[in-house]
Protein backbone atom coordinates (compact mmCIF):
# COMPACT_ATOMS: atom_id res chain seq x y z
CA UNK A 1 0.00 0.00 0.00
CA UNK A 2 1.15 3.56 -0.59
CA UNK A 3 2.64 5.44 2.35
CA UNK A 4 1.38 8.85 3.45
CA UNK A 5 2.49 11.43 5.97
CA UNK A 6 -0.08 13.46 7.90
CA UNK A 7 1.07 16.71 9.50
CA UNK A 8 -1.37 18.19 12.01
CA UNK A 9 -1.54 21.47 13.85
CA UNK A 10 -4.00 21.76 16.74
CA UNK A 11 -6.42 24.66 16.83
CA UNK A 12 -5.94 27.36 19.50
CA UNK A 13 -9.20 26.15 21.07
CA UNK A 14 -7.85 22.62 21.38
CA UNK A 15 -4.60 23.92 22.87
CA UNK A 16 -6.51 26.00 25.46
CA UNK A 17 -8.04 22.88 27.04
CA UNK A 18 -6.58 21.23 30.10
CA UNK A 19 -4.11 18.46 29.40
CA UNK A 20 -6.12 15.53 30.75
CA UNK A 21 -8.54 15.06 27.83
CA UNK A 22 -5.78 14.91 25.17
CA UNK A 23 -5.22 11.18 25.43
CA UNK A 24 -8.96 10.46 25.38
CA UNK A 25 -9.49 12.77 22.40
CA UNK A 26 -6.57 11.21 20.57
CA UNK A 27 -8.01 7.74 21.08
CA UNK A 28 -11.47 8.84 19.91
CA UNK A 29 -9.84 10.33 16.77
CA UNK A 30 -8.05 7.03 16.13
CA UNK A 31 -11.27 5.06 16.69
CA UNK A 32 -13.10 7.28 14.18
CA UNK A 33 -10.34 6.82 11.58
CA UNK A 34 -10.44 3.04 12.10
CA UNK A 35 -14.23 3.05 11.76
CA UNK A 36 -14.36 5.20 8.61
CA UNK A 37 -11.10 3.98 7.02
CA UNK A 38 -10.60 0.37 8.13
CA UNK A 39 -7.85 -0.28 5.56
CA UNK A 40 -5.57 2.42 6.99
CA UNK A 41 -2.53 1.10 8.86
CA UNK A 42 -0.69 3.56 11.12
CA UNK A 43 3.07 2.96 11.18
CA UNK A 44 4.21 5.80 13.48
CA UNK A 45 2.75 8.71 15.47
CA UNK A 46 5.02 11.52 16.63
CA UNK A 47 4.60 14.71 18.61
CA UNK A 48 6.97 17.20 17.01
CA UNK A 49 8.40 20.64 17.67
CA UNK A 50 8.04 23.32 15.03
CA UNK A 51 5.14 24.57 12.93
CA UNK A 52 3.26 21.24 13.25
CA UNK A 53 2.16 19.49 16.45
CA UNK A 54 1.88 15.90 15.23
CA UNK A 55 3.26 13.79 12.40
CA UNK A 56 1.74 10.44 11.47
CA UNK A 57 3.07 7.93 8.98
CA UNK A 58 0.42 5.60 7.63
CA UNK A 59 -0.45 3.34 4.74
CA UNK A 60 -3.70 3.69 2.81
CA UNK A 61 -5.02 2.02 -0.34
CA UNK A 62 -5.13 5.31 -2.27
CA UNK A 63 -5.12 9.10 -2.02
CA UNK A 64 -8.89 9.25 -1.52
CA UNK A 65 -8.63 7.27 1.70
CA UNK A 66 -5.64 9.40 2.77
CA UNK A 67 -7.78 12.49 2.16
CA UNK A 68 -10.48 11.04 4.41
CA UNK A 69 -7.92 10.72 7.21
CA UNK A 70 -7.06 14.42 6.77
CA UNK A 71 -10.74 15.40 6.78
CA UNK A 72 -11.45 13.37 9.92
CA UNK A 73 -8.43 14.99 11.57
CA UNK A 74 -9.70 18.46 10.69
CA UNK A 75 -13.12 17.63 12.12
CA UNK A 76 -11.55 16.55 15.42
CA UNK A 77 -9.89 19.81 16.47
CA UNK A 78 -7.02 20.33 14.05
CA UNK A 79 -6.73 23.83 12.66
CA UNK A 80 -4.67 22.45 9.81
CA UNK A 81 -3.98 18.99 8.44
CA UNK A 82 -1.95 18.09 5.36
CA UNK A 83 -1.32 14.69 3.84
CA UNK A 84 1.67 14.01 1.64
CA UNK A 85 2.58 11.01 -0.46
CA UNK A 86 5.82 9.36 0.64
CA UNK A 87 8.04 7.23 -1.59
CA UNK A 88 10.42 4.89 0.24
CA UNK A 89 14.04 5.81 -0.51
CA UNK A 90 14.87 2.43 -2.05
CA UNK A 91 11.93 2.76 -4.44
CA UNK A 92 13.04 6.29 -5.29
CA UNK A 93 16.48 4.95 -6.22
CA UNK A 94 14.85 2.30 -8.42
CA UNK A 95 12.92 5.05 -10.20
CA UNK A 96 16.18 6.97 -10.72
CA UNK A 97 17.82 3.88 -12.24
CA UNK A 98 14.82 3.39 -14.55
CA UNK A 99 15.42 6.89 -15.89
CA UNK A 100 18.96 5.81 -16.62
Language-model features and meaning:
Residues 1-38, 86, 90-100:
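Short S/T/G/P-rich N-terminal loop/turn motif that feeds into the first structured element of a domain
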Residues 60-90:
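An amphipathic, aromatic/His-enriched active-site/gating alpha helix that lines ligand/cofactor pockets
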Amino acid sequence: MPTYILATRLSPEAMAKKFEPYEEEGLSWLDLVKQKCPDVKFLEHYTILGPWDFLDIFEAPNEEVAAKVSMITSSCGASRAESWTAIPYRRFMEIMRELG
